[in-house]
UniProtKB/Swiss-Prot annotation:
Keywords on record: Cytoplasm, Molybdenum cofactor biosynthesis
The species this protein was found in: Yersinia pestis
Pfam family, one: FdhD-NarQ
InterPro entries, per database record: Cytidine_deaminase-like, FdhD
Primary role: Required for formate dehydrogenase (FDH) activity. Acts as a sulfur carrier protein that transfers sulfur from IscS to the molybdenum cofactor prior to its insertion into FDH.
Keyword Cytoplasm among record annotations: yes
Gene label: fdhD
The protein's name in its UniProt record: Sulfur carrier protein FdhD
Length: 274
């Protein structure tokens, strides 16, 4: 399998996922200059030769994205059920070719859906309403987080957003331990894709205790993906939707919104928050 490593902050010249373009800057006077823009390309996830989904994504950490998406969508239950991940760049985008175990591929064919996603869109193309909600085993109550350590995590979040720092155009998803230390994270123009990348990285790391921190709002699917991968706590910098709260309540996930220095709104299962 392609090696998966957490994103690290690097110099501007080395940053993948961003390009410089000529722009006209208007502030009283018009001034031509160069500016950094985040890259957004179509990424097709192809399982055993069959295209399953096309998402718009930032072209970095794509092996982690493929693994995390496969886990959070219930296509696989462990990384060992993927034998290889290979990238094939093309004129119109990038194909990520994933070799599944025969048992998992047979299951995928049974419930296969064709999706053509917008940026980070996770339900485009689903044919039936019943397909939106996946069965999730209720999470255990084995973890806790002291809100005093949330400020530490928030202060480190930009470390996993080198493209975001240049462009102001990416979401971040990070794994934080109970002391608020950021262990790793990813960024993408799509918040769901950033989360899938993180979940893919976490699957290859010995990170058990801790929580997910995202720079975006918390939609129902962010909750669903987090719970599918066994994480018990999700911190979102912005608000949560009503459906996100309902799903979090049902699957025993602690959902926290408006995660800011010195404050937070706990929507569900507050017993994990100290």
């Amino acid at each position: 399998m392609s090696q998966i490593k957490p994103s690290r902050l690097s110099s501007s010249a080395e940053i993948r996922g961003a390009r410089q373009l000529d722009v006209l800057q208007r502030h009283k006077l018009a001034e031509p200059q160069q500016d950094w823009l985040a890259e957004e390309v179509p990424v097709a996830l192809v399982y055993n030769g069959i295209s399953h989904v096309v998402m718009m994504a930032t072209p970095k950490d794509l092996a982690a994205f493929a693994l995390g998406f496969s886990l959070s969508e219930g296509i696989i239950s462990s990384p060992q059920e993927i034998y290889s991940i290979e990238m094939t760049p093309g004129c119109n985008g990038i194909e990520v070719n994933i070799e599944l175990s025969s048992r998992r591929f047979a299951g995928l064919k049974e419930r296969r859906r064709a999706m053509a996603g917008r940026t980070g869109c996770g339900v485009c193309g689903i044919e039936q309403l019943d397909d939106i909600f996946r069965p999730i085993t209720p999470l255990p109550f084995t973890q806790a987080f002291n809100l005093e350590h949330l400020d530490t995590a928030l202060a480190q979040l930009k470390q996993v957003q080198p493209v975001g720092q240049l462009t102001g155009c990416t979401h971040a998803a990070a794994w934080i331990n109970p002391e608020g230390e950021l262990l790793g994270g990813c960024e993408d123009v799509g918040r769901h894709v950033a989360l899938d990348k993180l979940l893919g990285i976490r699957a290859k790391q010995p990170w058990q205790q801790g929580a997910v921190l995202v720079s975006s709002r918390a939609s129902y699917e962010m909750v669903q993906k987090t719970a599918m991968c066994g994480a018990e706590i999700l911190f979102a910098v912005s608000a949560a939707t009503t459906l996100a709260v309902e799903v979090a309540e049902r699957c025993n996930l602690t959902l926290v919104g408006f995660s800011k220095p010195g404050r937070a709104t706990v929507y569900t299962h507050p017993q994990r928050i100290k």
